[in-house]
Each structure stands twice: as structure tokens, then as C-alpha cells.
A protein has these predicted regions:
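Short, aromatic-enriched amphipathic alpha-helices that serve as compact interaction elements
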Residues: 1-18, 25
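Soluble or luminal CAZymes and related metallo-dependent hydrolases
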Residues: 2, 6, 48, 88
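Residues within well-formed alpha-helices
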Residues: 9, 21, 76-78
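A solvent-exposed, acidic/Ser-Thr-rich amphipathic alpha-helical stretch
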Residues: 19-21, 27-71
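A beta-strand edge to alpha-helix "cap/lid" segment located at domain peripheries
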Residues: 50-128
Length: 128
């Protein structure tokens, strides 16, 4: 995974259940906004993110990255969230900023249970 984008590494580690290892990729003073249906969770440090991640309901959840990109010190991902390797519960768009040491110092994600920008493509089973 040495050539993987940090955003790919972050989701892979998070989905493996290693929450502490995922949070270790974050700068201590990370700022984040996580927009979920009906609410936005904001935080201002690594501890806030750890509290959020540990507070999520226990479920076999996986982020399937359908698109990734980077532009300088900002990385992007678009994908679906799949539970129990069967049910797609929604789609997300995420962006993160990396500091000069490569740590994630800002993170923003939005999640929608219905809308996908790739609806037509997914309906035809196409994927890059």
C-alpha cells in the first residue's frame, strides 16, 4: 500500500477495525465536519474524532472507494458504504488536507442514504 493515497489508507485501516491506528494518521489538532442525514458532527482535535468513531453503532461497515483523486495537499474520495458485505446504506464524498508532515489536519465528509452521482453507472455495473 505504499503508493496508496492517504485517504485510501485511512479508510482501509478504519474498515479493518483498527480505529486507534486510523486516528494516529490524524494531526493532533485536526478539524473535521461529518455531515450525516439530519446532523453535522464537528470536532477540533484527534480526541474528538476518536470519540466520534468509538461512539458509532457497532456494525460490519466498509467504505467502497469508487473514485479517488488528489490535488497537491488535498485528497478526495467518492464511494459507497456497505454493511455486512451486502447492503449499500448510502454514498459519501470526502476530502482531507495533509499537513507538511503528511498527517491529516482537516477532514470533511458528507453522506447521503439515497443520492449517488454515479447512479447510472452503478445501475449498469460499470466501475473504474
Amino acid at each position: 500500500m505504499t503508493d496508496a493515497l492517504m485517504i485510501e489508507r485511512y479508510y482501509a485501516i478504519l474498515d479493518s477495525g483498527r480505529i486507534d491506528d486510523a486516528v494516529a494518521l490524524l494531526d493532533e489538532s485536526i478539524e473535521f465536519a461529518i455531515a450525516l442525514p439530519g446532523t453535522v458532527r464537528r470536532g477540533y482535535n484527534r480526541s474528538d474524532m476518536l470519540d466520534y468513531l468509538r461512539g458509532r453503532p457497532p456494525v460490519d461497515r466498509r467504505h467502497v472507494l469508487l473514485r479517488t483523486s488528489s490535488a497537491g495537499d488535498v485528497q478526495f474520495a467518492y464511494g459507497s458504504v456497505v454493511e455486512n458485505d451486502v447492503k449499500t446504506t448510502g454514498y459519501f464524498l470526502a476530502a482531507m488536507h495533509l499537513d507538511s508532515d503528511g498527517a491529516i489536519d482537516a477532514y470533511e465528509v458528507s453522506f447521503d442514504t439515497e443520492f449517488s452521482i454515479l447512479t447510472k453507472e452503478l445501475a449498469h455495473g460499470k466501475r473504474d
